[in-house]
A protein has these predicted regions:
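Acidic donor-binding loop of glycosyltransferase active sites
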Residues: 54-55, 197, 209-224, 231-232
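Glycosyltransferases and closely related glycan-assembly transferases
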Residues: 11, 43-57, 63-78, 91-99
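Donor-nucleotide binding loops and adjacent catalytic segments primarily
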Residues: 5-10, 131-216, 248-251, 263-272
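C-terminal alpha-helical cap of glycosyltransferases
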Residues: 279-282, 296-316
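A short, well-ordered alpha-helix in the C-terminal region of glycosyltransferases
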Residues: 285-297
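Conserved nucleotide-sugar phosphate-binding/catalytic loop shared by glycosyltransferases and other
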Residues: 1-39, 45, 264-266
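C-terminal "capping" alpha-helix adjacent to the active site of nucleotide-linked donor transferases
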Residues: 257-264, 268-285
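Active-site-proximal region of nucleotide-activated glycan assembly enzymes
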Residues: 12-13, 72-132, 137
Length: 316
C-alpha cells in the first residue's frame, strides 16, 4: 500500500530495505528478525551514502529503525511520535535522533530534552474535499446525515460486524459510507443507504467533506485529521489484547478534550453502537465547537520548521 501511495509522487524516490518487526511477545521470528534489522542497516547506509540527505525524517514503525541507526553520524535525524506514548520503534530511534517531534504535549515527558511539541502533519489535500463530489461518488442525496465508518487499510472486523448488524436501524436515520478494509467487503449486503469500499485514497477528502460524523479506530494520525476537519467522531480503540494500549490513550485524550466520544470494544454490540452513534450526532455541535478552538490541530508547519532547522544546521 505504501508504494502505491507515494511511489508516483513527483520528487519522491521510493527505496526498499530489509526490516524485522519489533515484538513485545514471544515468537520464533524474534530469532531471525534481528538479522533482518542488521541487513537493513547496511542497505540503508548504502542508500544514505548515495543520496546524501541534508536531514533524515522518521515517522516511526519498525522499518524506520535500521534507517535511523544507519543515518547516525551521516545526517541530522528528526523523529516524529504520533501516539500519546512512544512505541517501541520510536523508543529506539529517539536515542539516535537529534530532535523528537510529538503530537501530544503530554508526550514530552517521555522523550526528554530532544522533544518539541509540534502536533502532527495533516495532508493538505484533505482540506480540498467537496461535499457534492462526495455525494456524487456515493450516490447519496444528502437529505439524511452521513456517517463515515473507517477502520484503516486493513479494516476493523469487530466494528464491521457490529455496524452491519445494526444497519437496518441505522439507515433509517443515516446514510452510511463504510471503508471496511481490504478483503472485508460483503457483497451480499444490499441495504439502501449503505455503500462499502475496501479502501479509498483519492476520493477520501470528498468523503470527509460529505460526512457529518465519523466512526473509527483511534490511531493518532486519523483522529488528528478528524480534529483538523472538525468532524465529531465515535472512537473504538484497539483493545489491550491486540495492541500496546496506545489507541486507548489517544481516545481518552480526545474524550477529555471534548473532541470525541469513546466506546470500548469489550462493550461493542449492535445496540451500544446504535445508541452511541445517535448520541454523537445529537451532541455534534458541542464537539465541533470544542475542536474549532484547538490551534494545534495541524502541525505541518511546526514539523517542517524543525526539519528545516536541522537541515540548515547540516548545510552550515
Amino acid at each position: 500500500i505504501e508504494k502505491s501511495l507515494v511511489g508516483d509522487l513527483e520528487g519522491v524516490t521510493y527505496h526498499t530495505i530489509s526490516a524485522g518487526k519489533l515484538r513485545r511477545y514471544f515468537s520464533l521470528k524474534n530469532l531471525t528478525d534481528p538479522f533482518k534489522v542488521v541487513g537493513g542497516i547496511f542497505q540503508a547506509k548504502r542508500i544514505i551514502n548515495k543520496v546524501k540527505p541534508d536531514v533524515v525524517f522518521s515517522k516511526g514503525g519498525f522499518v524506520s529503525v535500521p534507517v535511523v541507526i544507519a543515518a547516525k553520524g551521516m545526517a541530522p535525524i528528526v523523529a516524529h511520535e504520533s501516539d500519546y506514548t512512544p512505541g517501541l520503534a520510536n523508543k529506539i530511534t529517539a536515542r539516535f535522533a537529534d530532535r523528537v517531534c510529538v503530537t501530544f504535549e503530554d508526550t514530552l515527558k517521555y522523550v526528554g530534552a530532544k522533544g518539541v511539541h509540534t502536533g502532527t502533519p495533516i495532508r493538505p489535500e484533505l482540506y480540498g474535499g467537496d461535499r457534492q463530489r462526495g455525494l456524487d461518488f456515493t450516490g447519496f442525496s444528502g437529505e439524511k446525515p452521513i456517517l463515515l465508518t473507517m477502520g484503516g487499510s486493513q479494516g476493523a472486523q469487530a466494528i464491521n460486524d457490529a455496524l452491519r448488524s445494526a444497519l437496518p436501524r441505522l439507515t433509517r436515520s443515516f446514510d452510511i459510507i463504510h471503508l471496511c478494509g481490504k478483503g472485508k467487503k460483503d457483497d451480499s449486503i444490499a441495504e439502501p443507504g449503505y455503500v462499502q469500499y475496501e479502501y479509498i485514497s483519492k476520493e477520501l477528502p470528498d468523503l470527509f467533506a460529505a460526512a457529518d460524523i465519523i466512526l473509527s479506530r483511534a490511531g493518532a494520525n486519523a483522529i488528528f485529521e478528524f480534529l483538523a476537519l472538525a468532524k465529531p467522531a465515535l472512537l473504538i480503540p484497539l483493545p489491550l489484547s491486540a495492541s500496546r494500549g496506545d489507541q486507548i490513550l489517544n481516545a481518552g485524550y480526545f474524550a477529555r478534550k471534548g473532541y470525541a466520544m469513546t466506546l470500548d470494544q469489550a462493550g461493542l454490540t449492535p445496540d451500544t453502537l446504535f445508541d452511541s452513534i445517535h448520541d454523537l450526532y445529537d451532541r455534534r455541535l458541542s464537539f465541533i465547537s470544542a475542536m474549532s478552538g484547538d490551534s494545534t490541530a495541524d502541525g505541518t508547519d511546526e514539523v517542517l520548521d524543525v526539519i528545516r532547522s536541522e537541515a540548515e544546521g547540516s548545510i552550515r
